[in-house]
């Protein structure tokens, strides 16, 4: 009763900033953000990649104009030589400044992490450092390739009074996927948890059959069955995804004005987020599984959370950070003076500190501690 056919383009992702690289390396290689930063710093010192402590995921206009040098240099790195030559031959690098991968407004101090094109020190890299370097190279080269193209076919069928829906998707042109190291058969990022239906991957033969369908055709049904499932709780953070959550902490703020203030800053900076996690681990507040990189709270961590939540809950709300950022913005644009801002800040801290000193909630907290402890036996 219904038939829709359309093509869908999927462009290469933006370049790596430090948080994205830490997340990717945690996922692919099961290494901690601290280790990723250490390795990337080593690559930088060996002049293999650009400055690592950056929040930007794009190129500057000035760098885009000279990007030929970076690509041409990668012809000396055997795994990327063919791709680099293909890009130079096709000339796609000449227009990169006009794409979403170049944006001066999205850069504060440093542009995205990219290979420099100097490859002399590659031979001396450890196995894991070489993997990180290769990941950066592939992400960089991918932006010069066309989008991957998918063919989608959505079908609405009717049996008596019941309507049945099916959606099929097949890759017809791999585009950037061939350099990104993602197999054509792997359909990453195509699931949408908000959708009631999910695209079914199919091969070329199945696609050809679907392409011949016309509205009104009668389809022979082999069998009907009910597929049951359960909703799952959100996945636990790993070391990489927690870094991204810190970077984007403001997304949970409902107030649009305050959310805008914290956008682009979040918790910590690209240079300090890994160290913040390391400090929490060293103090015994959270635990890191070295093999899976999954992060879980400790009993001590949960108890501290309960104390803060009961005593000064505002410290757990990203809105507080956003309001402070708003004040700093006011100082920067001269809508308020630095003295006025500091007076308000000092007054707030003083009032909250005095309030906490007067709190006597030890007995109220005991049930929370006992409940948390029951999960750590």
Where are each of the predicted segments found?
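Basic, low-complexity terminal or inter-domain segments flanking catalytic cores
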Residues: 4, 8, 33-34, 52-377
């Amino acid at each position: 009763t219904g038939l829709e056919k359309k093509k869908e383009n999927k462009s290469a992702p933006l370049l790596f900033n430090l948080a994205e690289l830490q997340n990717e390396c945690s996922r692919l290689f099961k290494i901690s953000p601290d280790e990723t930063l250490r390795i990337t710093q080593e690559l930088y010192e060996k002049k293999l990649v650009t400055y690592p402590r950056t929040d930007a995921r794009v190129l500057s206009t000035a760098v885009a104009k000279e990007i030929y040098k970076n690509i041409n240099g990668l012809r000396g790195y055997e795994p990327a030589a063919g791709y680099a030559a293909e890009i130079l031959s096709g000339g796609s690098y000449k227009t990169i400044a006009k794409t979403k991968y170049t944006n001066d407004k999205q850069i504060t101090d440093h542009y995205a992490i990219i290979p420099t094109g100097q490859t002399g020190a590659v031979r001396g890299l450890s196995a894991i450092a070489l993997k990180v370097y290769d990941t950066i190279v592939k992400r960089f080269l991918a932006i010069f390739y066309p989008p991957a193209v998918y063919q989608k076919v959505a079908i609405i069928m009717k049996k008596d009074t019941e309507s049945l829906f099916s959606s099929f998707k097949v890759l017809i042109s791999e585009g950037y996927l061939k350099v990104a190291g993602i197999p054509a058969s792997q359909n990453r990022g195509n699931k949408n948890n908000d959708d009631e239906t999910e695209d079914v991957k199919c091969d070329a033969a199945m696609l050809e059959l679907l392409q011949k369908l016309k509205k009104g055709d009668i389809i022979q049904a082999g069998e009907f069955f009910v597929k049951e499932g359960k909703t799952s709780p959100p996945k636990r953070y790993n070391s990489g995804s927690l870094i991204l959550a810190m970077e984007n902490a403001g997304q949970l703020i409902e107030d649009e004005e305050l959310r805008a203030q914290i956008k682009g800053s979040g918790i910590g900076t690209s240079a300090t987020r890994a160290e913040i996690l390391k400090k929490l681990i060293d103090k015994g507040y959270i635990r890191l599984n070295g093999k899976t990189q999954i992060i879980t709270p400790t009993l001590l961590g949960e108890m501290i959370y309960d104390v803060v939540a009961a005593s000064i809950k505002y410290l757990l709300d990203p809105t507080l950070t956003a309001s402070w950022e708003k004040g700093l913005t006011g100082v920067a644009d001269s809508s308020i003076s630095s003295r006025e801002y500091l007076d308000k800040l000092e007054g707030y801290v003083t009032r909250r500190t005095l309030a906490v000193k007067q709190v006597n909630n030890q007995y109220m907290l005991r049930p929370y501690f006992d409940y948390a402890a029951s999960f750590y036996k």
